[in-house]
Amino acid sequence: MAGKQAVSASGKWLDGIRKWYYNAAGFNKLGLMRDDTIYEDEDVKEAIRRLPENLYNDRMFRIKRALDLSLKHQILPKEQWTKYEEENFYLEPYLKEVIRERKEREEWAKK
């Protein structure tokens, strides 16, 4: 029982650190999501290309709005900030698929 409490306490502590970092990074104040800020290497570019049109358009809207706010040295009103609890990693499944396919191609190339 004591072990479960220790795991629960460390999980809450780690979640608190994640929330703090999410807010400290500042991208949420511009309305961006975490996946909007990922460095675009070849795998990420391919994953973005595979996004459904509505997700791609939402991403482009957030990025363009963030650029506009940044140029004006402004941030969104607090009620429009992206919240940690509402974050969805929309690019992750597509990125995992692209990486899996690339690794599979590399394995085939070795044979």
UniProtKB/Swiss-Prot annotation:
One cellular component (GO) term of this entry: mitochondrial inner membrane
Membrane topology: Peripheral membrane protein
Residues that bear N-acetylalanine: A2
Main location: mitochondrion
InterPro entries xref list: QCR7, QCR7_sf
Keywords: Acetylation, Electron transport, Membrane, Mitochondrion, Mitochondrion inner membrane, Respiratory chain, Transport
Coiled-coil spans in chain: none
Entry-annotated residues carrying N6-acetyllysine: K12, K19, K78, K83, K96
Residues where N6-succinyllysine is found: K12, K78
GO biological process: mitochondrial electron transport, ubiquinol to cytochrome c
Superkingdom to which the source organism belongs: Eukaryota
Subcellular location field: Mitochondrion inner membrane
Record-stated family: Belongs to the UQCRB/QCR7 family.
Oligomer status and interactors: Component of the ubiquinol-cytochrome c oxidoreductase (cytochrome b-c1 complex, complex III, CIII), a multisubunit enzyme composed of 11 subunits. The complex is composed of 3 respiratory subunits cytochrome b, cytochrome c1 and Rieske protein UQCRFS1, 2 core protein subunits UQCRC1/QCR1 and UQCRC2/QCR2, and 6 low-molecular weight protein subunits UQCRH/QCR6, UQCRB/QCR7, UQCRQ/QCR8, UQCR10/QCR9, UQCR11/QCR10 and subunit 9, the cleavage product of Rieske protein UQCRFS1.
Protein's job: Component of the ubiquinol-cytochrome c oxidoreductase, a multisubunit transmembrane complex that is part of the mitochondrial electron transport chain which drives oxidative phosphorylation.
The name this protein goes by in its record: Cytochrome b-c1 complex subunit 7
Gene name per UniProt: UQCRB
